[in-house]
Amino acid sequence: MHFSPPLQKGTLLKRYKRFLADVALEDGSVITMHCANTGAMTGCAEPGSTVWFSTSDNPKRKYAHSWELTQTQAGHWICVNTARANALVVEAILAGEIQQLRGYDALSTEVKYGHENSRIDILLKSDSQPHCFIEVKSVTLLDEIQGDKGQGYFPDAVTTRGQKHLRELAEVAKDGSRSILLFAVLHSGIEKVAPALHIDANYSQLLKAAQEAGVEVLCYKASLSKHEIRMVSEVKFAYQVTKN
């Protein structure tokens, strides 16, 4: 996924009201931009970090600029625009870069399904195998305190919506379709992923139950730069002991 036109650079002053951020430009001016991320963004929104943003030519938008990437003071690259995760996974599937998801004939997005009025991120179909329902989650929370190098967690805040998605995926698996939770690792420092039991215990428990019901968990990491982001490798998923 190439950024075109090229992203522009600034310095983060603050993020506020969840969806807004003030950014200082190199000429000293300050602009307010949209932040497409509902999470806590722990470690992704520290004042003083370098941010890279896109600009829309849509005159109807209240905020023309969108925060896309953070370049931390530790040197990590993070994609904070969660809307990019789904598009990135779709691109990787169509290019055959996710080997577990090859062999399907049709791909749809945002399809209604389930008993809780949900929409699946990606639906794959084939005449020769069951439908494949894929829920994509963006992973950007890096544990830099415990000394376990490269450990990433999801979620970074309590997510009732994410809990609902796990229940829906489990029901799909029980009905005989293929059901997948795909963690898109969008932080250059993360090398492995675990459920954040210390943040959302209910989500962790539901994830374990979903796997027991037949839901598959995949974790793929993206390569990130100011020019492009793309899926490059599979990383490990494992449960962790509760943090004290």
Swiss-Prot record:
Annotated protein name in UniProt: Sugar fermentation stimulation protein homolog
Transmembrane segments: none
GO molecular function, one term: DNA binding
CDD domains registered for this protein in UniProt: SfsA-like_bacterial (cd22359)
Disulfide bonds, paired cysteine numbers: none
InterPro entries reported for this sequence: SfsA, SfsA_C, SfsA_N
Family note: Belongs to the SfsA family.
Pfam families in alphabetical order: SfsA, SfsA_N
